């Protein structure tokens, strides 16, 4: 079972907190489901894409490390083959999000506000 989450699940920003909280909820649900299904032969894979170039995102400011649907698909196929429970697309976004997740809140707020010009 492949569950599409988002890098936003790692930490919400002032301008995406509703979206980020729903993705964090999806991550939590998938984690619990994976535990419940352990030993059943059903794998649960959480995919955390960053900004993806699609028709829906046309006209939005492009985020750093943006990716394409085809690139996300490659990551998903690899995760299925390797049975990896959590993957990032692109893979390079994982260390960035790990760093952002561990920043003190005032620093994170200053960084994201400046980046968003908010």
Model regions: which residues?
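Active-site helix of classical SDR
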Residues: 22
């Amino acid at each position: 079972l492949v569950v599409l989450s988002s890098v936003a699940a790692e930490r919400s920003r002032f301008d995406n907190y509703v979206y980020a909280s729903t993705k964090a909820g999806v991550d939590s649900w998938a984690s619990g489901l994976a535990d419940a299904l352990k030993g059943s032969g059903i794998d649960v894979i959480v995919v955390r894409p960053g900004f993806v170039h699609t028709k829906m995102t046309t006209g939005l400011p492009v985020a750093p490390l943006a990716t394409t649907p085809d690139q996300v698909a490659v990551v998903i196929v690899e995760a299925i083959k390797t049975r990896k429970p959590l993957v990032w697309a692109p893979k390079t976004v994982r260390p960035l999000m790990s760093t952002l997740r561990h920043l003190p809140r005032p620093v994170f707020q200053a960084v994201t506000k400046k980046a968003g010009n908010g």
